[in-house]
Amino acid sequence: MTYLVLLLGLCFVLGGLAVASNPSPYYGVVGLVLASVAGCGWLLSLGVSFVSLVLFMVYLGGMLVVFVYSVSLAADPFPEAWGDWRVVGYGASFILVVIAGMIVGGLIECWKVGVVTVDSGGMFSVRLDFSGVAMFYSYGVGMFLVAGWGLLLTLFVVLELVRGLSRGAIRAV
């Protein structure tokens, strides 16, 4: 089980690196799906099945829509592939940053955080992840509204930036 969790953590980091160093939106989707599956599998191994399922639905439902939209706007006839030197350089530099962060974190010893599973507090009638979701929606209403307005503003800003001189892949007829 330990090796499975370590493998899921490695896949999560590699998926994040693939999203960060993607040469085109076509390949960014692969990294996003890898990171999403690995992160939700990691949460599932800790016993947080409901939150893992909700996050999986949100990531693959919402973020793939964004990637499909960006793919339709970036109609490259010859997209950059993973083997290009610029993409390999980005990936190598991101891996070096992650390794340096692990070394510095190990030297400072700030990683003294224990992993607690959902059922570790004893016997409860309601699992902790379900009660956490209820608190998430009851006490977090203001933050949800602020995050929703922020995402709406971000959508309009991105649409305005991408529009440019209306000479993109999608043109008004």
From Swiss-Prot:
Subcellular location: Mitochondrion membrane
GO molecular function: NADH dehydrogenase (ubiquinone) activity
Catalytic activity: a ubiquinone + NADH + 5 H(+)(in) = a ubiquinol + NAD(+) + 4 H(+)(out)
Coiled-coil regions, chain positions: none
Bilayer topology: Multi-pass membrane protein
GO CC terms, sorted: mitochondrial membrane
Pfam families: Oxidored_q3
Transmembrane residue ranges: 1-21, 27-47, 48-68, 88-108, 139-159
EC number: 7.1.1.2
Record keywords: Electron transport, Membrane, Mitochondrion, NAD, Respiratory chain, Translocase, Transmembrane, Transmembrane helix, Transport, Ubiquinone
Organism domain of life: Eukaryota
Family that this chain belongs to: Belongs to the complex I subunit 6 family.
Free-text function comment from the UniProt entry: Core subunit of the mitochondrial membrane respiratory chain NADH dehydrogenase (Complex I) that is believed to belong to the minimal assembly required for catalysis. Complex I functions in the transfer of electrons from NADH to the respiratory chain. The immediate electron acceptor for the enzyme is believed to be ubiquinone.
Protein name as annotated: NADH-ubiquinone oxidoreductase chain 6
Record lineage: Eukaryota, Metazoa, Chordata, Craniata, Vertebrata
